[in-house]
Amino acid sequence: MLRSTCLNRWRLFPQCAVIGVIASIAITPLAFAEGDDAVADVIAETATPIISPYDSRDYRVLTLENGLNVLLVSDPEADKAAASMNVRVGSAQDPDDLQGLAHFLEHMLFLGTEPYPESDAYQRYISNNAGSHNAFTAQQDTNYFFDIEPSALPGALDRFSEFFLSPLFNADHLESERNIVHSEYMARIRDESRRENDVLNQLFNPDNPTTGFAVGSRETLASPPEGEATLRERVIDFYHQHYDANVMNLAIVAPQPLDQLEEWVAERFADIPDNDLSVPTIDAPLVDSDTLPRYIERQSLQDRRQVNFYFPVPDPTDDYRTKPTQVIAHLLGDEGEGSLLAVLRDAGLADGLSAGVGRGDGNEALFTISISLTPAGAERLDDIEATLFAAIEQLRNDGLSEWRYQEQADLNEQAFRFQQHGAPQQEATRLSMSLSRYSVEDVQYAAYRMDGPDAERQQAYLDALTPDNMLRFYSAPDVESDTVSPWFNAQWKEQTPDQPGQALGGLALPGPNPFIASDLTLLEGQDERPNLLVDTPSFSAWHMQDERFNTPKVEWRVSLQSPTASYSAEEAVLTRLLASWLNDSLNESLYPAWLAGQSFSAYPHARGMTLSFSGWRDGQTPLIEQALEQLAHAEISDSAFERVRYQLQREWRNAPQASLTGQASRTLGEALLTPQWSSAELLAASERFDRGHLEDFRQRFLADLYVDAMAVGNLDADLAREQTQLMRAKLKPRLTRDAIANLTPLAASEEHSVLHPHSSRDESLVLRYLQGRDQTPAEQATAMVIAQWLETPFYQQLRTEQQLGYIVNAGYSPLLEAPGIALMVQSPDVESGTIAERMDAFLDEASQRLEQLSDADLAPYRQAVHDQLRQRDTSLAGMANRYWQATALEDVRFDRRDKLAELVLNVSLEDIKALWPSLREHTLDIRFNPGDEPSDVSTYREERSALPKVRE
């Protein structure tokens, strides 16, 4: 691809490109030095973005002369740099005769460019500099993103920008990547949401381009007949037709100053072609109105019953300033007392509900109410439909009061005022998408902005929610039909309702939210790490005051530990039932608190259960008190017990249908950790219980407790101590930590054992686990460096070159403190024995490469691991979880991560060569081919001994 003279000279004369490519700058005006008047002359406008008052980062938006919009965010505290390019083209632009082409093109861009022709050049550079990368193709967007060590950002941008300047579309990789796309398709073919969309696409208007087959397969991406344009020529043609600077939006989040980031962008992205393209629009309606109403049933592969009510509505994206659908979705999706869900739950018909707008194409969208059904609910679909329309009618009569809109707007303003930022990669991806859709001033504010109710637009959306404009879509495992969707093999049929349903009574709109916080002042004070606040034999509490995240929020974690929690599969089931019941029983009363920024959840673990409280400091004490009172004294009704047991049993029954990689990982944990129980064991044990068993267990569980607690956030020690005293008074712990059994890592067999997961999937898989010799930090550090060294060549050889499958990865995978390396391949075509042989060959070759490895070769891998370990926390919740996990590992100095990072830098070639043979000898394979019977994992586990903490 030819370059302009100016761009070729940029590396010597950067001013040329700055003058020649920047058409406008917005958000942060530049400070121009004398002699830079030519740059100042090209500023078209300046604008100020709406940002949180506590957002201290610097922003700048550039519009280059080629039309590329660029959002730069300088965050001096960031320890990663990230970039995301969003291209406003996606699967909706696929040609009819080459479905999946946009997705296939996304794959091809990673496989070499003119300056970097090696197919792994980009990935290798990113991986060697503590980074990660990926991309996704949606209906109207294709997004490419990466993060990396900040010092390596210029080199990453060099490689990244060439995706959009000089991709090779290497013919040598065309067939292999077509196979990879097919593998991705096969890996998703049993996904329930894709199966539902496949049926919906048969019902919607075929002239709407979002109804095509987005993923692609060997069939749809087959080489055209001789005499027609080749597949490679079609890919290149699509690229030139649709990839244009005018439909691209780039976001970069990095610690470097804005001027430096701008210089790098101008140098590298100015020559992206400007063909004066505009964002593609869709005019054909998504749904032909004369085809509604319709009643559809689809077979689900999972044991799950659900009904979705779809209503075609105008796409509300352009109405983001007033958000006319927000109050409607909020009230229909409400879960408090008197809500649609509460009425259906009380009748035993449903156990979950959501409402909102999705599948927007810029012209039309779907307002969707999704209801998760009980078996009884599946028998009363007409009554559920009638109750839904009764709730909608209630909204029409009294739901659009202005105070409801204002309450939502106030809550949005609270959330935006203390907006938390994610990791740089998440931020860059979100911002590039936001820049593609919203005005510059709203790139941060759009999701929160509510300028005032637009009564006319609200009414228009409410008027669309009628029986005549409805597509009712029911899915269940017992649906059978001869009609099958074309790409995801979903059986479906059209039904006619027998008779109108009978609406249930009890619906009521919520009143004003009593949980809205009023004291949102930020307390001054910053601790470096958690401090021990209470230390008794039966109760330990830690406290860390924080103001660095600029939010008056607090994260509490309270671990209730009992020796009764995991003695057996029966005890493990009862622990899960108790945690699930507590969540279920508090759902209605605490739903308004959740809306107001206060959340609570209970989750089970091997030693008991953890209570998690997250939200504003103001109002958290009564929430803690209510949850503890509910746990200790609330009645457990028969209906509540059956509801939560059914939900857990549904999860365990569906385990064989879950992702194969997830099943393999669970099998590995069941084999090398104790105590652990399989889904089948938990399901069998759950059949033996009734409400009385759970009540008895609650008494035993609460009678024998040891409690660990931690508060991290914007609260002082006095308030933390007051809340701790409340917990001690309510829970009355009396056991010591020594009475609680720990989850223990086990040593893998030296016999290279093979276990099969319990799965009904159609793909093959091998998860090979290489285990370290002990649990020392030095062993962990060495294994981490080895894993980093293996990552890129494993992916390159087994995925790119050998085309074994879409899911191919290698990485460090500890089980608690036990170090290990996991190699994983999932394939639609290659059976597990062959995959295992390819892994053997790769590891044999790695042994040979190890002999040639020098300390200089090893240095970038050590540095990459070190940088990953030293990454800063990007959210209050993330920091709280990290410190909380440290207490579970008895890291009460909270310095394990820093010490590990130091050890990593000192890992020597001798350390690696000493560990490598042992890793090869202590392996466990989790293998699966379709039809394999599950292994007796418990027998394998019972024959294992604990992995030593330190080698003798």
Q: What residues fall within each predicted segment?
A:
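Bacterial N-terminal signal peptides
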Residues: 16-28
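Mature N-terminal segment immediately following signal peptide/propeptide cleavage
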Residues: 52-84
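Non-catalytic, conformational "gating/processing" segments within enzyme and secreted inhibitor domains
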Residues: 234-267, 691-727
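His/Glu-based metal-binding/catalytic segments typifying zinc-dependent metallopeptidases
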Residues: 186, 278-337, 425-441, 446, ...
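Hydrophobic, small-residue-rich alpha-helical packing segments that form membrane-like cores
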Residues: 178, 182-185, 191-247, 253-265, ...
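M16 family metallopeptidases and their MPP-like homologs
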Residues: 73, 78-94, 101-102, 119-163, ...
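N-terminal secretory signal peptides that target proteins for export/translocation
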Residues: 1-11
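Boundary at the C-terminal end of the N-terminal hydrophobic targeting segment
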Residues: 31-35, 40, 44
